Amino acid sequence: MTSTHDTPLALLGYPQGTGRALRDLGLTAVSVPEGPLLEVLHACTALAFQGALVAANLQAGMLAVTQPDSAAQRAGSADVLAFVAGRAAHATCTLPDALLDALEDSGYPVRGARALLIGQGGDLGAGLALTRLGLGSLTLAAASHPEAEALARGLPASLKAHVTSRSDPALVTLAERADLIVLTAGPLPPGVLQPFHALLDLTGRAGGAASRAGSALVPLTRLPELRLARRLHHATGQRFAPDVLKELAGVLG
């Protein structure tokens, strides 16, 4: 019987040689061509690849050539695939669940928090995962008001929610009603952060703004390895301890 260790893992969009970094986990990983995507995925299925890790530059194109789950659809992208013979590859985006893992790890009390989510498009999908932790209220600031309204349609009916755009002049006033600011994409609008806020920064670029405003920064230091653990589980069915994936997460992004 063939074990999962004998079945190759595809690396889609990663440079040749990246697979060497996975050998210590007992995985055989092979970089495959980037396209045409549908032909590459059919070949992976025919060659009995168990799954694929998808590099960031190809993740948005996965939805058109796979069977995306609800997480991938909300995010507008997929970072990992699982292959099933005779069927389209099953695609998901692991960032939302990994974010919840990281928040639990940080100890930040999300339940009951009044959150302001700032971002655009699928990037806001990861932040919307916070609604599963019992937010007290949510203000959703997307690239435009119609985009925010579209994203809000999937929110729990019981959640007190308000939608706006990130360019709304009233955003600073709306931020004063929040205690948690979540930035999922783009720059932080001027004047939003106050000393009483906690900032959850998914862009990794707003730490300086938090420091200048005197705001607390919710630590997400283990997010990369927590996310990689979920990606590997989806692609291979195997569970790996996040602590052993820290260096590898830096390679695979």
Predicted regions and their residues:
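Rossmann-like adenosine-cofactor binding region
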Residues: 159-223
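Adenosine-phosphate binding glycine-rich loop
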Residues: 26-28, 200-253
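Conserved S-adenosyl-L-methionine
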Residues: 132-138, 157-159, 215-216
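Structural motif
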Residues: 11-16, 32-35, 54-58, 118-121, ...
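Phosphate/diphosphate ligand-binding glycine-rich loop within oxidoreductases
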Residues: 2-108, 206-209
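Short beta-strand elements in bilobed, periplasmic/extracellular small-molecule ligand-binding domains
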Residues: 22-33, 137-139, 159-164
